[in-house]
Every structure is written in structure tokens, then in C-alpha cells.
Regions:
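ATP-binding/phosphotransfer module of carbohydrate and carboxylate kinases, centering on a glycine-rich
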Residues: 1-69, 120-128, 173-317
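Glycine/charged-rich beta-loop-alpha catalytic/anionic-binding loops adjacent to active sites
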Residues: 94-103, 146-154, 284-293
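Glycine-rich phosphate-binding loop of actin/hexokinase-like ATP-binding domains
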Residues: 125-177, 181
């Protein structure tokens, strides 16, 4: 059995979906999950990447032990398209999938997970995918097939427009309340209680612990958005600033690709579950891109990876 493999390799877990191609259409036949990946240059980065690809593929192949993977595409967090990092990752995929008879894949592509997500969400034609979860990135495709990205540089460099940004700014707001720069508000205790803190000193100590990271900041975002909806002026300003940043990224992609009335698909917990934040983004966009059309994703990142793998099989070697 000849199969295509599509991977969605994130920081928390990796999914592999296998598919047959019948009459030009993809027919999924298996799915497996493995651990997450990190940047290849991070400590144990290559080892984690190998384990993620190998484990998820093995689980997906459990009901197809004789299956041969003809082509594989991986959308991975931290991979920059067109770099040496991409080439290293592709070599690792070939190594990870040297299964069964030990043969190596001839057709492999590793790219950023935002690109497989865009292909899955908008398989054909022009459109923009805005991802706002723990992090944020916007990627669009023009009428000519050209793609342009905005944001996605990581929280250390550019985390605005994300749940991390909302939570991080919210925590900073509570410290300004605590030291008297701003009037106190119930949001302060709500955030501190969620963090397990009872004082500003405890907050300061908590954020430097090894087990406190971007996801923990992001987990504070719902409290900030809820406080904004109840009239907390500081929280309202945070939500508005973050919404403007995300909207500006969407606008920048639309302008770069000359899209006057783009289809915009949103993914990620911040933009899909935090309604106050989503509404703020939509209101801002109505001013900057009045012709924008909001739509639903046709598929997920694994679907996008499989479509790209199918492209590899018809592309001349």
C-alpha cells in the first residue's frame, strides 16, 4: 500500500495523518500522535524532532504495517521556509521514516506549520489565515499563488495579538494596581489567585520559575478579556491594543498581496474562544479592510500537509 503522510508538529504534540489517493482524491486511512518539537538548535532539538516524527508515524501505521510512504510533508513550529534549518529538518524526516525495509523517502518537504495550516484552511485561491492562540502569525496567499507572512517572530520578539500578549499585559496591569499607579480592581486578585500568588513578591518569584512559561501567561487572557467586557478600563485598553496589532498584520498581508476584499479565516484559541477579543479585531478590521470576508477553515494543518504531499508526487524530481 502506497501512502502519503502529512504531519502537524507543534510544541506540545505532533500529529501524523496517512492517506491513500484514489481518483485524485485524498482518502485518510490512519492517524497517530507523538510528542512535540522544539527549535532544532535548542538543546536536544534534533532528538525531539526525530522522536516526534517517528512516534507519530508509527502510531498512524499501526493498522498498515506494510504501508510504504511515498511522500511526506511536515508543518513544524520554528521552521523558516527557504533556510538551512529547513534542509536539516528534511534530512531528519528521511531518517525518521526509514522504517520497514530501511529504504529512505525520495520526496520530503518540511516547512512552517503556518503554511500547512493555510493550505488546509484555504486549499485553493486567495485568502488570509490569522492564527492567534498562545502565539500569533498571519499568512496569506495572493491570486498568483504568492504567499506573505506577518508576525510569528516568537514572544521574545513580537508576541502582540496573541493570548500570551493579553495575559502578559494583564499581569503587568495588576502590578501597577498593586503599587498604586492605578486604582485597584478585582482583576488583580483574579489573576493572582489563578497563579497561586497572594502578593506582588509571590508574583515576582512565580514568573521566574522554570515551570512558568508562555502558556501560563496565555492562560490569564480569558480573565483580562472578561474584565474588559465588565468595564475595567485598563483591560479594555489591553484588548484594544492587541486587537489593533492583529488587525494591522492582516491588513499588511492584504496590502502586500493586493487583496481588496480578502477571505479571512481565523484559528487559535484567542481569536476563536475569546469573543470580546474577536469582536475587537473584527471592529478594527471593518475600518482598515471594509471588504474583508470572514470564513471557516476547509480543513486543518494535517489536511494541508497531505495536499502538499500530493503535489510532491506529481512534481518532476
Amino acid at each position: 500500500m502506497t501512502l502519503l503522510a502529512g504531519f502537524d508538529a507543534g510544541q506540545t504534540h505532533t500529529r501524523c495523518r496517512l492517506s491513500l489517493v484514489k481518483n485524485g482524491l485524498l482518502q485518510p486511512v490512519g492517524e497517530g500522535e507523538g510528542p512535540g518539537v522544539s527549535h532544532l538548535d535548542a538543546p536536544l532539538g534534533e532528538e525531539r524532532f526525530l522522536k516526534a516524527i517517528r512516534t507519530s508515524a508509527q502510531h498512524a501505521l499501526k493498522n498498515h504495517p506494510t504501508g510504504l510512504i511515498q511522500a511526506a510533508v511536515v508543518g513544524a513550529s520554528g521552521i523558516e521556509h527557504g533556510t538551512g534549518l529547513q534542509q536539516r529538518a528534511e534530512a531528519l524526516v528521511g531518517q525518521a521514516l526509514a522504517i520497514g525495509d530501511g529504504s529512505r523517502l525520495g520526496k520530503v518537504l518540511v516547512t512552517g506549520d503556518e503554511r500547512t495550516a493555510l493550505r488546509g484552511a484555504i486549499p485553493e485561491g486567495a485568502g488570509i489565515l490569522a492564527i492567534s492562540g498562545t502565539g500569533m502569525i498571519v499568512l496569506g496567499r495572493g491570486e498568483d499563488g504568492h504567499e506573505h507572512r506577518c508576525g510569528g517572530w516568537g514572544w521574545l520578539l513580537d508576541g502582540a495579538g496573541s493570548a500570551f500578549d493579553l495575559g502578559h499585559q494583564g499581569l503587568q496591569l495588576t502590578l501597577r494596581m498593586a503599587d498604586g499607579r492605578l486604582p485597584d480592581h478585582p482583576l488583580r486578585l483574579q489573576i493572582w489567585n489563578q497563579m497561586g500568588c497572594d502578593s506582588h513578591a509571590a508574583v515576582k518569584a512565580r514568573v521566574v520559575q522554570n515551570d512558568f512559561g508562555t502558556a501560563d501567561f496565555a492562560a490569564l487572557a480569558p480573565l483580562v478579556v472578561e474584565a474588559a467586557s465588565q468595564g475595567c478600563s485598563g483591560a479594555e485598553e489591553i484588548v484594544q491594543r492587541s486587537a489593533v496589532t492583529l488587525s494591522n498584520c492582516i491588513d499588511a498581508v492584504a496590502r502586500r498581496l493586493s487583496l481588496l476584499s480578502p477571505l479571512v479565516v481565523c484559528q487559535g484559541g484567542a481569536i476563536t474562544h475569546l469573543m470580546g477579543f474577536r469582536t475587537a479585531v473584527q471592529q478594527t478590521m471593518r475600518q482598515s479592510i471594509p471588504g474583508a470576508r470572514w470564513g471557516d477553515a476547509k480543513g486543518d494543518a494535517c489536511d494541508g500537509a497531505l495536499l502538499m504531499a500530493q503535489d510532491l508526487t506529481v512534481r518532476p524530481s
